């Protein structure tokens, strides 16, 4: 059953007059936007000295596989707010974002695994979210020719009867020749 909250979202007006300063302050205080380097800088990304592209410069990382001349790239993604507003498109967007991030490392996306986290499945609205997310994942994987090779489902994720936003976390892997080109997400020099 389509959740009732979506009717209210569809009628939201975006015609608010906001100053640039208010928009700037709200945007850059949002945890979805701010720098997350304090998280990924806490662990050793150079274990066994096989890291080609560690965390920080792209949203995907690569490690070499010494015996093969190849490298394995990986990205993990999900935007729960997008999935809350439109579960099918939000889940598809998570797959596509992972695919783009893997491609940015120079690798070809090969497969995904997922971790599907939802509220109480006895609630028809939660099951509708779950079904819609599965449809989005299926369609995006078909478009990218990336099979789902594993995953898990975690249900009953709620506090005081309020379920979590639909959270279809996607991890994608890709393979590349070690000498292949990768794209940088940052500028190599200042613009003029």
For each predicted feature, which ranges?
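Hydrophobic topology marker
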Residues: 186-190
């Amino acid at each position: 059953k389509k959740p009732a909250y979506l009717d209210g979202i569809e009628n939201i007006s975006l015609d608010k007059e906001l100053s640039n300063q208010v928009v700037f302050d709200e945007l850059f205080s949002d945890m979805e936007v701010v720098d997350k380097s304090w998280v990924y800088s806490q662990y050793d990304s150079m274990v066994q000295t096989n890291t080609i592209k560690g965390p920080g410069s792209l949203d995907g990382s690569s490690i070499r596989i010494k015996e093969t001349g190849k490298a394995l790239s990986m990205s993990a993604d999900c935007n729960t707010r997008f999935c809350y507003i439109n579960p099918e498109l939000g889940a598809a967007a998570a797959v596509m974002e992972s695919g783009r991030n893997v491609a940015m490392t120079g690798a070809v996306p090969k497969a995904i695994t997922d971790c599907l986290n939802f509220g109480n499945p006895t609630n028809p609205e939660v099951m509708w979210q779950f079904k819609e997310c599965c449809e989005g994942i299926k369609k995006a994987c078909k478009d990218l020719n990336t099979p789902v090779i594993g995953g898990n489902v975690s249900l009953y994720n709620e506090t005081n009867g309020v379920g979590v936003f639909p959270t279809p976390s996607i991890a994608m892997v890709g393979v590349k020749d070690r000498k292949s080109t990768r794209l940088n997400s940052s500028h190599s020099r200042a613009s003029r």
